[in-house]
C-alpha cells in the first residue's frame, strides 16, 4: 500500500439496481447517497443497473429515469463525486452529456473484456467534458491476463485515466486477480490508475479486492450489504473493516457504513443478496451476474431449474447484453427434457 489512500467507489445505486429490478425510489436514492456521503466514500455510482439508457424490455424497466436518479443523488451529496456507467451501444454520448449536466462527474465506460475498441468515442467525449474517465472491462475472466492488458492499453490510449478489472460473473479467485493486475501494470503508464470490481458469487468478493490492492490497485468498488447483481458485490462495510485491520487508509466511517447497510439497504431486498444455490451457480459457471433474476423468471415460467439454465448459459459463453437468449436456452432445455 505504501501509505496511499484507497479510492472507495460505491455501486449500491447502480449495480444494486439489479437486486431490486431497478426499482429504487427517488427517496431511496437520496437516503442512500446521503449515508454514503456522510461516511465519506469517494464516489457514488448512480444509473440503471445496465447503465445509462439501460431501462428497456431486454434489461428491465426502471422506476425512474437515469437523470432523475442522478439528480436526486447530486442534490444531497457534498463530498463524494457522482459517477455513472455507460455501455456503448446502450448509452450514447448525448446521454453522457445529459448525465454530466445532471451532476455526474465520473463515468465508467464499460465493454466486454475483448471489445474495448467500441469505447473510443465515449471515452474521448467524456474527457472533453472534463469527466474522470474510467475504462471498465466486464467479464474479465473470459480472456487471458495478457489479452486483457492489451484491451486495457487500448482504453488508456483513448484517454481513460483508470482501467478496471471487472469480475462480472464473480468467477475469479485471488490468483486470477493477481495475474490480471500484474499484466495490466506491466503495460499501462505509471500514472494510469487501476480498479477492481468484484462479485461475491464464490464468496471471494472481499478477498479478491484485497488481492487487487496488494497488487497496486488504486480504486475498489463495493456496495452496502453487497447490494448488487447475483450474490452481490464486495460488501462495502466488510471490505472497509478488513482494510482497516490491514492498516490501509480508506478515509471512511466504518460504523456509519455498517448502520446504513443494515438499516437502509438490507430491508429493500425482495430477494436476499447472498450466496445460495442459484448465485453460486453464476460464479461456478462464469455467467454474467445480472442474468440471475431473468433466469429465475424463466425457470418459473417454463418449469425448469434456474441452476440448469445458468449452467447452460455458461457452457454457451453468453455475455452481458444477451439476456434475450435466456428464454431461448430455457425453451431448448424444456424441449430436450
Curated annotation (Swiss-Prot):
Substrate binds at residues 14-15, 168, 197, 288. The keyword Cell cycle does not apply. One of its GO terms (biological process) is 3-phenylpropionate catabolic process. One of its GO terms (molecular function) is 2-isopropylmalate synthase activity. Residues 6-258 form the Pyruvate carboxyltransferase domain. PROSITE patterns: PYR_CT (PS50991). Its EC number is 4.1.3.39. It catalyses: (S)-4-hydroxy-2-oxopentanoate = acetaldehyde + pyruvate. Pfam families: DmpG_comm, HMGL-like. The active site is at 18 (proton acceptor). Keywords: Aromatic hydrocarbons catabolism, Lyase, Manganese, Metal-binding. Mn(2+) binds at residues 15, 197, 199. PANTHER family: 2-ISOPROPYLMALATE SYNTHASE 1, CHLOROPLASTIC-RELATED, HOMOCITRATE SYNTHASE-RELATED. Belongs to the 4-hydroxy-2-oxovalerate aldolase family. Interacts with MhpF. This is 4-hydroxy-2-oxovalerate aldolase. It comes from Shigella sonnei (strain Ss046).
Amino acid at each position: 500500500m505504501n501509505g496511499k489512500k484507497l479510492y472507495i467507489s460505491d455501486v449500491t445505486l447502480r449495480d444494486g439496481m439489479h437486486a431490486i429490478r431497478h426499482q429504487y425510489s427517488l427517496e431511496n436514492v437520496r437516503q442512500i447517497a446521503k449515508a454514503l456521503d456522510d461516511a465519506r466514500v469517494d464516489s457514488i455510482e448512480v444509473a440503471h443497473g445496465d447503465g445509462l439508457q439501460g431501462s428497456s424490455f431486454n434489461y428491465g424497466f426502471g422506476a425512474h429515469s437515469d437523470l432523475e436518479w442522478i439528480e436526486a443523488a447530486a442534490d444531497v451529496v457534498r463530498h463524494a463525486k457522482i459517477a455513472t456507467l455507460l455501455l456503448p451501444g446502450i448509452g450514447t454520448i448525448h446521454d453522457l452529456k445529459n448525465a454530466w449536466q445532471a451532476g455526474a462527474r465520473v463515468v465508467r465506460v464499460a465493454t466486454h473484456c475483448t471489445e474495448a475498441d467500441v469505447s473510443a468515442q465515449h471515452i474521448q467525449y467524456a474527457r472533453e467534458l472534463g469527466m474522470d474517465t474510467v475504462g471498465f472491462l466486464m467479464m474479465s475472466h473470459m480472456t487471458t491476463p495478457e489479452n486483457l492488458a492489451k484491451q486495457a492499453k487500448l482504453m488508456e490510449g483513448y484517454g481513460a485515466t483508470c482501467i478496471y478489472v471487472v469480475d462480472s460473473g464473480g468467477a475469479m479467485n485471488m490468483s486470477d486477480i493477481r495475474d490480471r493486475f500484474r499484466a495490466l501494470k506491466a503495460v499501462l503508464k505509471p500514472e494510469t490508475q487501476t480498479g477492481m470490481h468484484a462479485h461475491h458469487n464464490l464468496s471471494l468478493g472481499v478477498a479478491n479486492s484485497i488481492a487487487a490492492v496488494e497488487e497496486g490497485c488504486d480504486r475498489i468498488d463495493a456496495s452496502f450489504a453487497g447490494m448488487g447483481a447475483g450474490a452481490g458485490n464486495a460488501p462495502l462495510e466488510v471490505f472497509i473493516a478488513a482494510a482497516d485491520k490491514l492498516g490501509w487508509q480508506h478515509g471512511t466511517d466504518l460504523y456509519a457504513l455498517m448502520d446504513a447497510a443494515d438499516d437502509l439497504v438490507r430491508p429493500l431486498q425482495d430477494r436476499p443478496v447472498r450466496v445460495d444455490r442459484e448465485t453460486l451457480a453464476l460464479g461456478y459457471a462464469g455467467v454474467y451476474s445480472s442474468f440471475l433474476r431473468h433466469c429465475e423468471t424463466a425457470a418459473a415460467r417454463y418449469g425448469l431449474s434456474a441452476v440448469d439454465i445458468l449452467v447452460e448459459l455458461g457452457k454457451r459463453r453468453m455475455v452481458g447484453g444477451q439476456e434475450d437468449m435466456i428464454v431461448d436456452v430455457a425453451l431448448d432445455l424444456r424441449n430436450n427434457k
